[in-house]
Amino acid sequence: MSETVREIPGAIGPLEALLDVPHGEPRAAVIFAHPLPIKGGTMHTKVVFQAAKALTRIGCVVLRFNFRGVGRSAGSWDNGRGEMDDYRAAVDFMAGRYPDLEMWAAGFSFGSYIAMTVGADDDRMCTLVGIAPPVNRYEYTSVKLSTKPKFIVHGESDELIPLKAVREFYAQLHEPKELVEIDRANHLFDGQASEVGDALEELLTDFTCETR
């Protein structure tokens, strides 16, 4: 498994990025979005790191990047609008680099809102993965309408997004879909970030878009 430091083109300037590459030929390309920038979220957040490593272990090539204004990425916080454009730029980069691979949209917290929303509307993306999605704070309208496979991982004791709200959101989603609840985990999965990786491996090791 190798990790390549990259700078990818963004809508208003370069975006700092890391490309995690598996051993052997990759089977899918994942674009992973980090949590809320104004609350300290970056592509190095523990859950993002653990998720990326888990996905590379099961054969995915994973692009994680810093939204505008984070780290060495150009620009400044844009209340989600510009961050959507950043994610689209990351999708364009991966589609150009890996044109023959399935593309999966994934993100943690605020990043799940960005990734799943863009992924639901982009025909190049065939799978939506959300970790601790803030469904009580953002509209996931496109995701609710989408028939693409959806995978959600959430903490049982999330203090910001109650599990009840996520279960209600999940009930509104079209099949195929799967929800994994991690016992005792809070919103940041403190002390349990590796369990997020374990959950993704269990959900996605044998998954391909063609099988759904």
Feature annotation, model-predicted:
Residues 23-64:
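Short, surface-exposed "cap/lid" segments of acyl-processing enzymes
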Residues 185-197:
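Catalytic histidine-centered segment of alpha/beta-hydrolase-like enzymes
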Residues 172-188:
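Catalytic histidine neighborhood in serine/cysteine hydrolases
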Residues 77-97:
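Alpha/beta-hydrolase active-site loop
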Residues 146-147, 151-154, 158:
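Short beta-strand/loop motif that positions the catalytic acidic residue
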Residues 1-25:
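N-terminal cap/lid segment of alpha/beta-hydrolase-fold proteins
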Residues 107-115:
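Gly/Ala-rich beta-loop-alpha elbow adjacent to hydrolase catalytic centers
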Residues 157-161, 188:
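Acidic catalytic loop of the alpha/beta-hydrolase fold
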